Amino acid sequence: MPRDKQKRGRRAEAKRKRDDVITDPTVLKRQKSSDVCNYPNPSYEQLEIRGDYIPLDEEPVDYTGTPFYGLLDIEEQEYFSHASGLLELNQFETEEEKSIFIERVYEEANGKELKIACSQSCSRLMEKLISASTVSQIKRLFSKFIGHFLNLVQHRFASHCCECLFIHAAQHVTSEMKKKSSKEKENLEEDSTSELQLEDLFLKAISELEGNWGYLLTERFASHTIRLLLLVLAGKPLRNSSTTTVIASRKKEYLASKVGTQLDPSISEKRAVPTSFNKALEKMMKDLVAGLDNTYLRALATHPVGNPVLQLLLSVELSHMGKSKAKDPDSLLRRLVPDENLQGDGESANFLKGLFYDPVGSRLLETIVQDAPGKFFRLFYKILVRERIGSFSRNEIAGHVVVRILERLSKDDLKSAMDMILPEVAPLVERSRLTVIKALIERGIVRGVDLGPLAAALLSAYGDDAVSRINNMLKLQRSNQESDGTTSSSNTSSPEQLHGSLLAQAMLKSTGPLSELVQSSLLAVTTETLISIAQDPVVSHVLQDALTLPTSTPQFRRQITSRFSGKIAELALHSSGSHVVDALWPATKDLLFVKQRFAEELVVHERALRDSFVGRAVWRNWSMDLYKRKRGSWIAIAKGLEDSTDINPNALTHKPKSNIDLARARFAAKANGSKAPS
């Protein structure tokens, strides 16, 4: 078959043509030349400008707004990742060995602190280091961050490092303040950067953020840091159930426990702060809302990021600066609610009514209800809530605000509120919205309100049958179905089951018909159901409270404890059931024969109990070693003749000191310069 005629050397000729077009080989390289516009904007970096090119009328883009601190190389990443794993394992033999390791990591990280803080893989190491650092190390790291806080608090990973640094530095501000007042000097080797007090370092960090509060207020990451700084300056608890959800999300992971570091108890308590902090707090709060009008402030009330900051601002203003601050026309509360009379169709009243049903704004309304002055709260309740509290309690979102309102009502107002809510009990039970009912019971116990009508309403809602009543309240059928499946019930417990368990626990605290509703139901179920309740991690708390609370009568305890005969060993080896076995000890304080029967069951299964972690705890709590060796002493404890704190056999038998103990005491006394014991 004939072939097409082709010219030899066509590829070489095409290559020569390309070489003729580009005569300068340096143009191919990524280098800036004098013929090209020297702008950082890539649109200006062109290898060739054609004749038909028309330049755009735009300014060069400035890329220097967010600094880039560089990346860790592969070896550094491997080293710091390995160090992070060692800190999390926390398998150091001594604290000294751990402190030496931490200091070596700090030496390796010297000059790379900002890179580590901004690294996705190594920022967690920085948090762990801060959690285990000494005061001088915290000061040293704090001073390295000075000058960069405005950028760090807006960074996805570095912002967490800043929060961790502020939390652990705040623990030592009070102690430094006391030492400064008593003119004591630390005998520590500190470099020039750690000569600054933490008070001064905090003030420097805040000064860096000044002028940017309005933007940072709603910034995704920086807003968390602002909330934390408000708590630090105000001296409010930093790790508290009431503040944790405002500072961080529910997914926030605290690494201090993972590295075996115990936080100062003062972190969960109100702290004394320097006078300069109070001045900085007032200035910071004023600057945060200075450029915002009232309309924008109200818009922040429903903003997912700005709302928590607004909550803290309002809480600090009313609790830290005094209730009289609310009378100031420039106060945050008056700017949000300027109308003092709360007229029905007024702007302030409509704003507060809208917050009831908003999933974000209702949290701000809870803060207002909790911290507002009494005069404002009484007016708010009288005009906006009292006649509508029943309809508010029906709503899933407004119900949380109703709970806060019930906490502040007097006895008479609480009784009238309960009368308004009683018709809504049945629909609330049907929808498993039990928080308002639980709050009614708890506040009724505190205020001394008769809860008989509420018990009758609950009996009507759950039914007269005791077995179906406890099944509906604790959602036992769903729990049994989940336990029969592949997924354990501990991982799939529903919110309805949790709320039902909390309601039952609240009912057990009330003397009278409410506690009898739960107790009669527990007595009516079968033994298998009772054991399944004891082994459920959520509803087992109901059984524990039923056995130990003062509302538990001797007749009820005698009937319920006998149901566990033959099941004690099985429960003692279960993670949740073991707590029920522990509760059976005080429940049988006047039932010695029942307690001895349970002890015999534990002795029979001694080997299995000793091989189990929870089993060993039950063995120790029941003082079974004493039961085997000194039965008389054990019976004395079981009858309550001995102090319940002396259950430990070592505390019961006061043995004379051995020779080695005496030698240790003499050595310790000699080291302290005191007289040796005889």
Swiss-Prot record:
Gene3D superfamilies xrefs: Leucine-rich Repeat Variant (1.25.10.10)
Source species taxonomy: Eukaryota, Fungi, Dikarya, Ascomycota, Pezizomycotina
Task: Tell me where in or outside the cell this protein is found.
Answer: Nucleus, Nucleolus
Question: Region entry Disordered: which residue ranges?
Answer: 1-24, 477-496
GO terms (BP aspect): endonucleolytic cleavage in 5'-ETS of tricistronic rRNA transcript (SSU-rRNA, 5.8S rRNA, LSU-rRNA); endonucleolytic cleavage in ITS1 to separate SSU-rRNA from 5.8S rRNA and LSU-rRNA from tricistronic rRNA transcript (SSU-rRNA, 5.8S rRNA, LSU-rRNA); endonucleolytic cleavage to generate mature 5'-end of SSU-rRNA from (SSU-rRNA, 5.8S rRNA, LSU-rRNA); ribosomal small subunit export from nucleus
Cleavable signal peptide: none
Q: Does the keyword Cytoplasm apply?
A: no
Q: What are the annotated GO cellular component locations? A: 90S preribosome; nucleolus; preribosome, small subunit precursor
Q: What is this protein called?
A: Nucleolar protein 9
Query: Which InterPro entries does the entry link to?
Result: ARM-like, ARM-type_fold, NOP9, Pumilio_RNA-bd_rpt
Q: What are the GO MF terms of this UniProt record?
A: RNA binding
